Amino acid sequence: MNPGQKQEHDQYPLHDTQFVPQQMDRNSPFADPYPEDQPPPSGYDHQPLLRDNAPSYPPDPFGQPGGYPPQSTMYPPQPMGPPSPNMRYGEAPRRQPRRYKTTRRVKLTHGNLILDCPVPTPYLQAVPIKDTKEFTHMRYTAATCDPADFASQGYTLRQPILQRNTELFIVLTMYNEDEILFARTMHGVMKNIAHLCSRVRSNVWEGPKAWEKVVVCIVSDGRKKIHPRTLSLLATLGVYQDGVAKNVVGDKPVTAHIYEYTTQLSVDPEMKFKGADKGMPPCQILFCLKENNQKKINSHRWFFQAFGPVINPNVCVLIDVGTRPGKTSIYHLWKAFDISSNIAGACGEIRAMSGTAGVALLNPLVAAQNFEYKMSNILDKPLESVFGYISVLPGAFSAYRFTALQNDENGHGPLEKYFLGESQHGADADIFTANMYLAEDRILCYELVAKKKANWVLHYVSSSYGETDVPDSVPEFISQRRRWLNGSFFAGCYALFHWRKVWASDHSFVRKLMFMFEDLYNTYNLIFSWFALGNFYLTFYILTSALGAESLDPKPFSANVASILHTILNYIYILLIIVQFILALGNRPQGSKWAYFGSMTFFAILMVYMMFATIWITVVGVQDAVANADGSFTAMLGESTFRNIIISIVSTYAMYFIASFLFFDPWHMFTSFIQYIFLSPSYTNILNIYAFCNTHDVSWGTKGDNTVSTDLGVVKSKKDGSGDTTVEVEVPTEQKDINEAYEEACVELTRQVEPEVSHRDAKTKQEDYYRSFRTRLVISWIISNLILVVLITNENILASFGTFEVRSTSYLGFVLWSVAGLSAIRFCGSGLYLIFRIFMG
């Protein structure tokens, strides 16, 4: 080296270990050609990629050379002369960045591989804060342990190192969601953190520094399953760097790759960057990329068992990637815990995304689900919140108090029961338990309320909401509801079977009585759902046959025509039921898309005729009741048709309207009510039959992956002279390479994505044809509903109870009044919830 020449050293050691500086060889072909002490040549690009918020590119990167006339082009291009073997057609290949790696000797921390990696220069130039290590370096940890052993194996996180108290610990669980869905959720969380920073008068949040009390944990289920564009988005936030992770450390396979970084950027679903100039505060991100695909419940194990005890938060918020929380929704969830110290869990409203100007509601399937979600949030959740026990806090958007989740000193408690679901799937568990743990969040809710020597309750927060996509195709809808229905049915049986556990808790006697009343209410609902198949058929049979009854005057058409229509439609109904069993026992919904679509269409047509019969009978019944009673309402109640059919139906739907207006949310009654009515036969017949006929299928759609990969590299450890354990690691160290990888991630987000066409493989097609299962549950379900139908419709059986018309009218009145009674209980609970909300917040 010439005297006076500036000596350059690597300024970014990967860890706190002291390294011997190595002189940079300027003659190497891999060296940076423009040292810092020499000016670069003219035209050298100093423009950082994110300085103008988003990269802009000219429409034509290769302009027309001057002096030449415009050249006409032909598409597709025609080869000149004989085709060359090297000629290639199609999209130009993407630029492949080089990976310069240097072998470094790194000292292990408590035997664990931990690396502090500098973030890309273009990122730092685009953000305002760059004075501390949490903003300039990304921390990588290669976890080689089970989640339950994370803390005991010497692993730690940045929050205890920085001595920060965490009030909110938010987890985003994902599998293979794309960058749009991830950005929708992550940007929504960032806006919530910005709202927390605006609460300057709060004793907890204390204004602009509120972000220091919030940690966002992103858990991805499987390194080879994550969407590559989602990884690119995380890289542009500074959270993820390619080439750092390793498969094996010291002969131990890595189970999770943990990246920690405090980002100052957010990306909205339109792929636009938002920073401090747009009001976005910093955000502490903990990205856990699991090596293997082990299902969502294992992701929650990393969150609750590995990271939770280290961070020790007050409130944990669970959000599925794809769900967009409202701008202040997370604050309102947290506020419920702050106001009431005995709240163990809370949830907000789950809304179905309706698209711009509600265009998605033009799909009847989406509209029906929108109505279902709305009425659940207006009637069901408020009632359960008044009792103190909500049967399910949706995993898509809910929150728990971390201390309430903890097990006792013997290891028994809510989390112990919750994580049993990870080992209770497949052949190792009985069919009842395996189906029950399809809805393990219901088990967690019950275990929290029934926790021994505690008086925890669950609460619904109507001012908090999260928006999510709902299935817009028939196969996806049926597959989703199969897991929901089976899980809720068996988990409901579990809660009712263990009703005594509530009496071992420290709840007051009045609260325990309220729980017992709720158990009776749920038992009646469970029995009603068991006989829903028979009840719906009987309702159809009785109403359509009544159009030809002699007592009905006037009739819409002659008795002969009414009888013929009733017979034909009755046979069609029975045929459709048989078809549903055939499809459910031998086919996947994806393999019988048009059969299910046709079935839904025919059931909707039958519902139209059924509604016509209901309206006609109602109008005639009211006229007869008024004429016979001379205007006396008491005398009108004596008319069985008026009392059993008209009042029960009108009161049920009237409560729907009144409750919706009380919650200032009535629009679904006008935009989605009719679609729900027409699809209600499909809810009862198609969804229930498919769910019960597939109780053998206890899968989540994914299978555990236990293989050890080595594509990231293997880290081998050895002892040095001082007795410390060190490893040799190959990681990107040249700032130029780090910057190139960052720019590649940014460019990846600007690339147009071609829609992928999914194809079924031969094995799946074969399973579509050969899967069959018949259990005693399905047989008993069919027989019990069949007996009910025969008892009511047969002329000779139970003749002592009157004629068919008398028996059918009485039973229909029982069914309709049961529906009205259950709706009345929900309506009263909804009203009490609104009253308590006024006085208690």
Curated annotation (Swiss-Prot):
It is an enzyme of class 2 (transferase). GO terms for cellular component: cell septum; plasma membrane. The chain crosses the membrane at residues 302-322, 385-405, 526-546, 564-584, 602-622, 644-664, 673-693, 778-798, 816-836. It comes from the Eukaryota. GO terms for molecular function: chitin synthase activity. Residues 1-13 have a biased composition (Basic and acidic residues). InterPro entries: Chitin_synth (IPR004835), Chitin_synth_fun (IPR004834), Chitin_synth_N (IPR013616), Nucleotide-diphossugar_trans (IPR029044). Residues 76-85 have a biased composition (Pro residues). Keywords: Cell membrane, Cell wall biogenesis/degradation, Glycosyltransferase, Membrane, Transferase, Transmembrane, Transmembrane helix. The keyword Phosphoprotein does not apply. It catalyses: [(1->4)-N-acetyl-beta-D-glucosaminyl](n) + UDP-N-acetyl-alpha-D-glucosamine = [(1->4)-N-acetyl-beta-D-glucosaminyl](n+1) + UDP + H(+). GO terms for biological process: cell wall organization; chitin biosynthetic process. Its EC number is 2.4.1.16. It is found in: Cell membrane. Pfam families: Chitin_synth_1, Chitin_synth_1N. Residues 1-98 are annotated as: Disordered. It is a multi-pass membrane protein. Polymerizes chitin, a structural polymer of the cell wall and septum, by transferring the sugar moiety of UDP-GlcNAc to the non-reducing end of the growing chitin polymer. Belongs to the chitin synthase family. This is Chitin synthase 1. It comes from Phycomyces blakesleeanus (strain ATCC 8743b / DSM 1359 / FGSC 10004 / NBRC 33097 / NRRL 1555). The gene is chs1.
